[in-house]
C-alpha cells in the first residue's frame, strides 16, 4: 500500500512539475518581449483557436504591464477565449472581473454583449438537440440572465454596434421564457392541477403577449375554467380567443394533452 501511495504521489508531483514547467517556459520565452509583441502573439493564438495558450499569454501580459491599455483589453480577450473554449464559468468570471475593475471602460458595451452571448449559447438539453424544437426547453434561469445582460446593453448603450443583435436575441429569449411557462402549464393540465395551469396561462397572456403561446394559453385557460366549474369565466375566455384568433383550431376542439409533441411529456 505504501508503494502504491508513493507511486501516486510521485505521479502527481511530476504532473505538477510539468504544468509549472510549461508556465515557466512561457515566461522565459517572452521575458524580453514588449507589450505590443506579447499582445500580438496572444491574438495570433486566439485567432488560431489555441485558447489555452492565448489565455496564458494574456495573463503574462497583464502581470508585466498591469497599467497598459493592452492589459485592460487582455482581460476582455481572456473572457472571449474562455467563451470560445466552452469554459462558461471562467468566461463569466473574467467578464465580471473586467466590469468591476473598469466600470467606465469604453468597451463596456462589448463586455455586456459577451456576457449575454455566454448565457445565450449555454448548451441545449438532450431533447433540444434530438428534436430541434424551440428554446423553451432551456433552463429558464439561463434565459432570464441572458435577457437581462442584453437588456442592460441596449438600455445603457442604445447606439452600440452590438445593440441590434442583442435586441434580436432578446426577442428570441422572450419567446423562450413564454415557452418555459407554457411547458409548466401543459404539465399541470396533464396532471389535472387546473388552478395551477390557469395561473400559468394567465401569466403568459399577461406577460408574454407577443409570443406564439398566447393562443394555446387561452385554450388551456378556457378548459381549466370549465374543469373548475366556472362557466362564465370559460365563456369570457373563449370570446377573447375568438376575437384574437378567429381561425384557431381550439375553437373547434378543446385543448387536449394529445395536441402536444411527444417530447413535451418528458418535462
From Swiss-Prot:
Domain of life assignment: Bacteria
Chief localisation class: membrane
Signal peptide: 1-16
InterPro entries per UniProt: BamD, BamD-like, TPR-like_helical_dom_sf
Alphabetized UniProt keyword annotations: Cell outer membrane, Competence, Lipoprotein, Membrane, Palmitate, Signal
CDD domains referenced in this protein's UniProt entry, alphabetically: BamD (cd15830)
GO-annotated biological processes: establishment of competence for transformation; Gram-negative-bacterium-type cell outer membrane assembly; protein insertion into membrane
Cellular component, GO, one term: Bam protein complex
Classification via SUPFAM superfamilies: TPR-like
Membrane topology of this protein: Lipid-anchor
Family assignment from sequence similarity: Belongs to the BamD family.
HAMAP family per record: OM_assembly_BamD
Subunit details: Part of the Bam complex.
UniProt function note: Part of the outer membrane protein assembly complex, which is involved in assembly and insertion of beta-barrel proteins into the outer membrane. Required for efficient transformation of Neisseria meningitidis by species-related DNA.
Designated name of the protein: Outer membrane protein assembly factor BamD
Organism: Neisseria meningitidis serogroup A / serotype 4A (strain DSM 15465 / Z2491)
Amino acid at each position: 500500500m505504501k508503494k502504491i501511495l508513493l507511486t501516486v504521489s510521485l505521479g502527481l508531483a511530476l504532473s505538477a512539475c510539468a504544468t509549472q514547467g510549461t508556465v515557466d517556459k512561457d515566461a522565459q520565452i517572452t521575458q524580453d518581449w514588449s507589450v505590443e509583441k506579447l499582445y500580438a502573439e496572444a491574438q495570433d493564438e486566439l485567432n488560431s483557436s489555441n485558447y489555452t495558450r492565448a489565455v496564458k499569454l494574456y495573463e503574462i501580459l497583464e502581470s508585466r504591464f498591469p497599467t497598459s491599455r493592452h492589459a485592460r483589453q487582455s482581460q476582455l480577450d481572456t473572457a472571449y477565449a474562455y467563451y470560445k473554449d466552452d469554459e462558461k464559468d471562467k468566461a463569466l468570471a473574467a467578464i465580471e472581473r473586467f466590469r468591476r475593475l473598469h466600470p467606465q471602460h469604453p468597451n463596456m458595451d462589448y463586455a455586456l454583449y459577451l456576457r449575454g452571448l455566454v448565457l445565450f449559447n449555454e448548451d441545449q438539453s438532450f431533447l433540444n438537440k434530438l428534436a430541434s424544437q424551440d428554446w423553451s426547453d432551456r433552463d429558464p434561469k439561463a434565459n432570464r440572465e441572458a435577457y437581462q445582460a442584453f437588456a442592460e446593453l441596449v438600455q445603457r448603450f442604445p447606439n452600440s454596434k452590438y445593440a441590434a443583435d442583442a435586441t434580436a436575441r432578446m426577442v428570441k429569449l422572450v419567446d423562450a421564457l413564454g415557452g418555459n411557462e407554457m411547458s409548466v402549464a401543459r404539465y399541470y393540465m396533464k396532471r389535472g392541477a387546473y388552478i395551477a395551469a390557469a395561473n400559468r396561462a394567465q401569466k403568459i397572456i399577461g406577460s408574454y403577449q407577443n409570443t406564439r403561446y398566447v393562443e394555446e394559453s387561452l385554450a388551456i385557460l378556457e378548459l381549466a375554467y370549465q374543469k373548475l366549474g366556472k362557466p362564465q369565466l370559460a365563456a369570457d375566455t373563449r370570446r377573447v380567443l375568438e376575437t384574437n384568433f378567429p381561425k384557431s383550431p381550439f375553437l373547434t376542439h378543446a385543448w387536449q394533452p394529445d395536441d402536444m409533441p411527444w417530447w413535451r411529456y418528458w418535462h
